[in-house]
């Protein structure tokens, strides 16, 4: 989760991965934006923004729509998980890895016409670090920032309290957004950024509309208007795609339906990877779940391949940790706790629960979570754990589970990049506190070489897996369906944004 961040895409993926789709129904001429007829892109999505100010809003729905489209960052992440320039054309790092100097794009402007200058960058970064309404996750990502200084109009220097491998990566996402704070607007209702699109409207419960930024400082977008339309039923999106109402399903959240798009004359199917770890999360405040034997029992009780097959059409990757294969410190830890119901029963008896145990499993009503919850509940009952399941509206889940921590177990996809660090925060909604793991994460962040960073994070991931801090069920695939006219969509979902920068249609 960062969840804020953390729902750093939940989907955006499902949820962040959250099943999404793009409808190009009303597109006319292939001349693109600026032609005689407007090019309109309609995007069907399952995760609606719970707010429009990324600094104060949790959930993946907000960055899914706004990040890189309306708001830009100094640096961005590409579909291969690499950090690339955006508002900063280049940057340097001091030998001790504590001072970052960013050289800004001199031509960059906000949609209002104001320059994206050094002072705008300073004000935006300090807003995240010092803002009283900034989400907890974003504040934690800026904790290491000691000072932000405008060296001159187009250069910014950021001084950290110590070396941090994580910090620059965090700057590719919500924590690194540069806001037009001088705009005469309330950012909670009217986003104001420098991206290729401008915010137009939000019809709560229905849609968000973006329009082409006619004064964009970079290469302009190839569509004139984007309508993100929200579906509570992922199958309804499939039906809409098949009937010609949609032109893109930008993360198929009913993978069983992929065979319905086999007509190569009409559809293209892209299959990539994501950062979306589907986690059976534990509330470590619960006395029973504080016992590692109970957590290990749950891990042994779960048949993860059966969950992939039964809930996700056989699509997905077993991982066994909070590290996706696209991270350089990935190791396959999926056999740490093999499916072994007898071992699970023995561990429960050893922990004093031979007569059984009852736990609440509260999940968001995102496409992947309820079917997974039903399978998890059935498998746990086989070893003597009675599971009381409850499906919640996503906004309710964020308030009750994520903020108030009113749950025993939950299922959610954490889709933000480099999110292993979330387990090092005892104030996070899991309430996990393992000094050995926390020390390893701090040591990894303070390394100054890639090799040291990788080796230390591998150790940390292994400690986390051995401690059964959660049950990492599987990694979500990124399954995208488009019409044959659509181009410019990356197969991998490695960030929180549904990036429209290069999307086009030949229709």
Predicted regions and their residues:
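Surface-exposed binding/hinge segments that line
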Residues: 96, 103, 137-181
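N-terminal lobe/hinge region of extracytoplasmic solute-binding protein
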Residues: 45-95, 126, 192-193
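Structural transition elements
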Residues: 313, 317-350, 368-371
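Long beta-strand-rich cores associated with HINT superfamily self-processing modules
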Residues: 480-507
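Ligand-site clamp/hinge motif
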Residues: 185, 213-259, 386
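Extracytoplasmic/peripheral linker and loop segments enriched in polar/acidic and small residues
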Residues: 386-397, 421-485, 507
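Gly/Pro-rich hinge or "lid" segments in bacterial periplasmic/extracellular proteins
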Residues: 166-221, 225
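Alpha-helical secondary-structure segments
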Residues: 116-126, 153-159, 195-196, 223-225, ...
């Amino acid at each position: 989760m960062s969840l804020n961040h953390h729902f750093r895409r939940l989907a955006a993926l499902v949820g962040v991965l959250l099943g999404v789709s793009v409808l190009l129904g009303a597109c006319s001429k292939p001349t693109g934006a600026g032609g005689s007829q407007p090019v309109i892109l309609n995007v069907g999505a399952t995760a609606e923004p719970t707010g429009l100010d990324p600094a104060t809003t949790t959930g993946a729905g907000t960055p899914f729509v706004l990040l890189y489209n309306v708001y830009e960052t100094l640096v961005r992440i590409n579909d291969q998980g690499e950090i690339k320039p955006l508002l900063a054309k280049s940057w340097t790092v001091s030998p001790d890895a504590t001072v970052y100097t960013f050289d800004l794009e001199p031509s960059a402007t906000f949609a209002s016409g104001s320059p994206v200058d050094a002072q705008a960058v300073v004000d935006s970064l300090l807003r995240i670090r010092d803002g009283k309404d900034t989400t907890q996750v974003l504040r934690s990502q800026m904790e290491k920032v000691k000072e932000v200084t405008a060296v001159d109009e187009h250069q910014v220097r950021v001084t950290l309290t110590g070396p941090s491998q994580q910090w620059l990566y965090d700057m590719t996402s919500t924590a690194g957004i540069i806001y037009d704070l001088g705009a005469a607007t309330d950012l909670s209702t009217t986003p104001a950024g420098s991206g290729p699109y401008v915010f137009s409207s939000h019809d709560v419960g229905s849609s968000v509309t973006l329009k082409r930024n006619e004064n964009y400082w970079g290469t302009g977008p190839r569509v004139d208007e984007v309508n993100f339309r929200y579906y509570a039923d992922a199958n309804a999106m499939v039906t809409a795609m098949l009937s010609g109402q949609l032109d893109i399903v930008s993360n198929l959240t009913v993978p069983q339906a992929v065979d319905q798009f086999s007509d190569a004359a009409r559809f293209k199917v892209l299959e990539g990877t994501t950062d979306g770890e589907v986690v059976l999360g534990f509330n470590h405040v619960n006395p029973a779940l504080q016992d590692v034997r109970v957590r290990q029992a749950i891990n042994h009780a779960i048949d993860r391949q059966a969950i992939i097959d039964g809930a996700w059409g056989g699509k997905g990757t077993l991982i066994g940790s909070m590290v996706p294969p696209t991270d350089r410190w990935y190791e396959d830890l999926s056999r740490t706790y093999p499916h072994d119901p007898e071992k699970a029963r023995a561990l429960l008896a050893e922990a004093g629960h031979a007569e059984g145990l009852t736990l609440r499993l509260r999940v968001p009503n995102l496409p992947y979570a309820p079917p997974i919850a039903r399978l998890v509940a059935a498998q746990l009952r086989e070893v003597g754990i009675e599971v009381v399941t409850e499906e919640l509206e996503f906004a309710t889940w964020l308030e009750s589970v994520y903020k108030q921590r009113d749950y025993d177990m939950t299922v959610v996809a954490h889709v933000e990049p480099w999110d292993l660090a979330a387990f090092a925060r005892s104030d996070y909604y899991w309430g996990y506190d393992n000094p050995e793991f926390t020390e390893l994460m701090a040591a990894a962040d303070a390394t100054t070489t890639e090799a040291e960073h990788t080796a230390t994070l591998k150790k940390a991931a292994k400690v986390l897996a051995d401690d059964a801090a959660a049950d990492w069920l599987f990694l979500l695939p990124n399954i995208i369906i488009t019409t044959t006219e659509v181009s410019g969509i990356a197969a991998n979902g490695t960030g929180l944004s549904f990036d429209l920068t290069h999307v086009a249609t030949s229709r």
